[in-house]
């Protein structure tokens, strides 16, 4: 039976893909069969007239995963907009059943699954007669969250508000990772201390341009839960 975790963030462009890639890389370098999955990707790359899931390609490259990265993303859109708007622009119906089926397929191929979200935690995935929010997917997959946040000014507010929203939806958060952390920045240092005290969660850091995630392997594995 596979174990999974969901990587989400306090906002878009916080560094989910970067952190996800480092996590998958760390597990795979420890000879752990870890895979990657993303339900919906917008803002895809066009290479040689072919659409490419850029986030997935990045994770594959960093973590040295072989194969076609498009196969680990259920829906891929070219427009760099919210998933629900991308689906509307392309007249595509996003199906929860397909997401679950694709996720289960990845699970059958791996022992650990790292799932990357889209945007921040409050992200409409499909918004028509049927409505799917990102939190609906997380609850359907029944896996806990690692929350990625910024390290700088405003991090406390954004992190606490995100955690309150997650708590409202009865989803477990295992840890927080502060991205682009500067060990010499007094704001970053204080944010980490305050967030640990306010949330009672372990708060890890990832310095800019890091090639490894600063989380002990034993602790990282504990954040994954059985699916």
Curated annotation (Swiss-Prot):
CDD domains: DTBS. One of its GO terms (molecular function) is dethiobiotin synthase activity. The keyword Cytoplasm applies. Mg(2+) binds at residues 17, 55, 116. Pathway: Cofactor biosynthesis; biotin biosynthesis; biotin from 7,8-diaminononanoate: step 1/2. Substrate binds at residue 42. ATP binds at residues 13-18, 55, 116-119, 179-180. Catalyzes a mechanistically unusual reaction, the ATP-dependent insertion of CO2 between the N7 and N8 nitrogen atoms of 7,8-diaminopelargonic acid (DAPA, also called 7,8-diammoniononanoate) to form a ureido ring. PANTHER family: ATP-DEPENDENT DETHIOBIOTIN SYNTHETASE BIOD 2, DETHIOBIOTIN SYNTHETASE. Belongs to the dethiobiotin synthetase family. This is ATP-dependent dethiobiotin synthetase BioD. It comes from Clostridium botulinum (strain Alaska E43 / Type E3). The lineage of its organism: Bacteria, Bacillati, Bacillota, Clostridia, Eubacteriales.
